[in-house]
């Protein structure tokens, strides 16, 4: 849209001429100052390094089989299996809690008749009765005594061909494997004090966490993995296990370089991306057997998660690109099921996820380099969608899946309800996965991809984990704003030129062709195309653009947006992060919502008119920060400005900044705004007029102030290019369909142009009145 020029001026109004800054500093200071801007481009798009760089891994990997350790005496950790692997018969291990429990384990070779053998247990030589009737299996025997000078009694046995046994301390008990392999299982025979019980082991051993009990079962019954038996694995001391493993700190801010004015900050962050798809399902008219469209739509999602103990508020926008159009036609009869178009994403498609959070990294995302990211993959599976037919069994679209794999990251801008946010755009390539999708009761089946009918499969969100790293150029002083050199003096000849130029601009309103104006208002005018028709400034576009931005920085519109942005930024960086982005945004919207009181407080129509007028003056900011495809007052004013700049004979490089700044404030002063709630439209004007009416009949209904207050906070605000009086006059004299009415209510540029080309006097008169308001 043409109003892109105003958005561009707002987002780039910080740009200044570096040489001017150096000259100004040198005039005030006696010391030499060197400004090195570094490898950054002063454009709307920061340079991006697509190299992955060095990516540290924040995952602490704990080995499943920890060992082998040398024979030793130590306090066995709670909730860990001690897997003992002796190589010969004899004493294997013993332990005690030093008060009322002594236990010992011995290993007996195969084919041993009942006999008494001597063992050294608890520092004493004792004789124990042992036996092993098996000719192939080794036998572990567990003995326990309850007194220091008591006698050991046999409690349990484990027969095994692998010469492996294991025990674990947990819940005040000792757990032990018993039975015969390959069907041995765990049990417990002893209650002890876990904190003070020590174990003395005469053989090599391993440690396994309790979470790997199933794996311990496998080792006991089937033996150790081959790598433990075929390689020369050297046992280490148990003291080596006391080394504390710490996670690498990946969420960090690093000062890369620093000068007097600027510093480069490297931000490394873990990231949790949550997103969901949105879709639109449109049913055709008729008997109810046909659907016109099933398509993907962009979807905003707000959520919170914890990063290094800090609660992060995040905002994502998910959109798709490169969709594939499919259709199904069951026949030509009105009762034949058909879908005119349904979208599917597959290998040639991309998914874009714009991510922003309230951390420090995103507050300084203006000039960025060395941007990289490392993300995992996610599988998105389609769910079922039933096509509700009036009669007969319902066809069901089901299945379909794609895998999203990271394909790069760049900078982007998210437009929230109140402000645009510098964010990261993660791009994902797609690969199709099982299952394919189909529509029951039709011949359509075996197609791969993810259809738009139910892409979320009734899950709350999809989640992707990973991390990103970037280097951002920020002011050295964290509280310092980027300096802007502003001129405070105006020469008398410049004021004279401006006076003459204003008169010429106002006279040129009669020479604007309405049809061409609508076409121009729908073009995305940028800085260059706006000024390309001015011959005297073509060779100095860069310098002139910088001067325009400097001047626009001081305009009322820029100041209002700046105040709104600052309040948004301050709220996002506050100590309390529990509120969502929408809740934070509502703080910035208080300038609008607090201007309206409850209907009980509106004593008279005059009071309501005063408050509605106050609200309407603030609605331009609300509309300005919400980008839509509909025509706005700023689109028309920018198109008028472009037309007059091309036609003017007195425009010059020195006068353009003032003219553009003035036009943003003075063009179309009598604006009217509209919000639509189902079949009811609320319309308010700068002059305090307000209407509520039905969109299908244009009959007025009572103006619900409380409902209006909620709508302007949560719903898009539209420019009322064709206001209520004009619409009612048009309907009374010419008659319009409901579709035409909705398109006029939404300021659809194509519909407006059709009425103008048909020389409709009511619409032409309304547009001409708006052009006449574009005065300086």
Swiss-Prot record:
Region described as Spike head: spans on this chain: 65-224
Site (Cleavage): 231-232, 241-242, 247-248
Keyword Ribosomal protein: no
Gene Ontology CC: one annotated term: host cell endoplasmic reticulum-Golgi intermediate compartment
Placement of sequence motif YGL motif: 448-450
InterPro entries in alphabetical order: ConA-like_dom_sf (IPR013320), Rota_A_VP4 (IPR042546), Rota_VP4_MID (IPR035330), Rota_VP4_MID_sf (IPR038017), VP4_concanavalin-like (IPR000416), VP4_helical (IPR035329)
Disulfide bonds: 318-380
Span list, region Spike body and stalk (antigen domain): 248-479
Residues covered by region (Hydrophobic): 389-409
Positions of the UniProt region annotated as Spike foot: 510-776
Coiled coil location: 484-511
Motif mapping: DGE motif: 308-310
Alphabetically ordered keywords of this record: Capsid protein, Coiled coil, Disulfide bond, Hemagglutinin, Host cell membrane, Host cytoplasm, Host cytoskeleton, Host endoplasmic reticulum, Host membrane, Host-virus interaction, Membrane, Outer capsid protein, Viral attachment to host cell, Viral penetration into host cytoplasm, Viral penetration via permeabilization of host membrane, Virion, Virus entry into host cell
Cleaved signal peptide residues: none
UniProt xrefs under Pfam families: Rota_VP4_MID, VP4_haemagglut, VP4_helical
GO annotation, biological process: permeabilization of host organelle membrane involved in viral entry into host cell; virion attachment to host cell
Record-stated family: Belongs to the rotavirus VP4 family.
Further details from the record: In group A rotaviruses, VP4 defines the P serotype.
The protein's name in its UniProt record: Outer capsid protein VP4
Source lineage: Viruses, Riboviria, Orthornavirae, Duplornaviricota, Resentoviricetes
């Amino acid at each position: 849209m043409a109003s892109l020029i105003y958005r561009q001026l707002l987002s780039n109004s910080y740009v200044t001429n570096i040489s001017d800054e150096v000259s100004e500093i040198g005039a005030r200071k006696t010391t030499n100052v060197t400004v090195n801007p570094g490898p950054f481009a002063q454009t709307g798009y920061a340079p991006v390094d697509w190299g992955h760089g060095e990516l540290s891994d924040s995952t602490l990997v704990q080995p499943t089989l920890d060992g082998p350790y040398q024979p030793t005496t130590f306090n066995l950790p709670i909730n860990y299996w001690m897997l003992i692997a002796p190589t010969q018969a004899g004493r294997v291990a013993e332990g005690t809690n030093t008060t009322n429990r002594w236990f010992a384990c011995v290993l007996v070779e195969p084919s041993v008749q009942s006999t008494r053998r001597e063992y050294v247990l608890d520092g004493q030589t004792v004789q124990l009765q042992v036996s092993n009737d098996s000719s192939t299996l080794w036998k572990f025997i567990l003995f326990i005594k309850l007194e220091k000078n008591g006698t050991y009694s046999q409690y349990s046995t484990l027969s095994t061909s692998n010469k492996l046994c294991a025990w674990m301390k947990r819940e005040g008990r000792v757990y032990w494997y018993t039975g015969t392999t390959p069907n041995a299982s765990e049990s417990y025979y002893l209650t002890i004090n876990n904190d003070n019980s020590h174990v003395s082991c005469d053989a090599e051993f391993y440690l396994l966490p309790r979470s790997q009990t199933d794996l311990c079962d496998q080792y006991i019954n089937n033996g150790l993995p081959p790598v433990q038996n075929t390689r020369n694995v050297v046992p280490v001391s148990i003291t080596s296990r006391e080394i504390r493993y710490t996670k690498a700190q990946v969420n960090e801010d690093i000062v890369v370089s620093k000068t007097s004015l600027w510093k480069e900050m490297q931000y490394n962050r873990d990231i949790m991306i949550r997103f969901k798809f949105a879709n639109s399902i449109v049913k055709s008219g008729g008997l109810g057997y046909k659907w016109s469209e099933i398509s993907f739509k962009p979807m905003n999602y707000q959520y919170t998660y914890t990063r290094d103990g800090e609660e992060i508020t995040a905002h994502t926008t998910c959109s798709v690109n490169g969709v594939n159009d499919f259709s199904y036609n069951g026949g030509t009869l009105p009762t034949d099921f058909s879908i005119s178009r349904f979208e599917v994403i597959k290998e040639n498609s991309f998914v874009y996820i714009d991510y922003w959070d309230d951390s420090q990294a995103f507050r300084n995302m203006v000039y960025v380099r060395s941007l990289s990211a490392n993300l995992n993959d996610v599988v998105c599976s389609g769910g079922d969608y039933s096509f509700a037919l009036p009669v007969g069994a319902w066809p069901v679209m089901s299945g379909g899946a794609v895998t999203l794999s990271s394909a790069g990251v760049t900078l982007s801008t998210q437009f929230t309800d109140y402000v645009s946010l510098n964010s990261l755009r993660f791009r994902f390539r797609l690969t199709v996965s099982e299952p394919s999708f189909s529509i029951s009761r039709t011949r359509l089946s075996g197609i791969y991809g993810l259809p738009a009918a139910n892409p979320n499969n009734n899950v709350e969100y999809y989640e992707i984990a990973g991390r990103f790293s970037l280097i951002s150029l920020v002011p050295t002083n964290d509280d310092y704003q980027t300096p802007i050199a502003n001129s405070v003096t105006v020469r008398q000849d410049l004021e004279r030129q401006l006076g003459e130029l204003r008169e010429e601009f106002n006279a040129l309103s009669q020479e604007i062709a309405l049809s061409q104006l609508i076409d121009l208002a729908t073009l995305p005018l940028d800085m260059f195309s706006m000024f390309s028709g001015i011959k005297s400034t073509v060779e100095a576009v860069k310098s002139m653009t910088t001067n325009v931005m400097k001047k626009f920085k001081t305009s009322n519109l820029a100041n209002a947006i700046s105040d709104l942005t600052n309040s948004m930024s301050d709220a996002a960086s506050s100590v309390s992060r529990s509120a969502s982005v929408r809740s934070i945004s509502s703080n910035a919207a208080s300038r609008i919502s607090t201007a309206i009181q409850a209907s009980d407080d509106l004593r008279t129509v005059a009071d309501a008119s005063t408050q509605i007028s106050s609200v309407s003056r603030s609605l331009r900011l609300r509309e300005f920060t919400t980008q839509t495809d509909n025509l706005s007052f700023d689109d028309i004013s920018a198109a008028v400005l472009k037309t007059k700049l091309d036609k003017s004979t007195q425009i010059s490089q020195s006068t353009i900044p003032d003219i553009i700044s003035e036009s943003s404030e003075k063009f179309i002063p009598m604006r009217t705004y509209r919000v639509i709630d189902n079949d009811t439209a609320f319309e308010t004007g700068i002059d305090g007029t307000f209407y509520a009416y039905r969109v299908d009949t244009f009959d007025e209904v009572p103006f619900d102030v409380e409902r209006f207050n909620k709508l302007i906070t949560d719903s898009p605000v539209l420019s009322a290019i064709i206001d209520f009086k004009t619409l009612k006059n048009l309907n009374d004299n010419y008659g319009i369909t409901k579709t035409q009415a909705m398109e006029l209510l939404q300021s659809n540029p194509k519909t407006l142009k059709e009425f103008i080309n048909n020389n409709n006097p009511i619409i032409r008169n309304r547009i001409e009145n708006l052009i006449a308001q574009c005065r300086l």
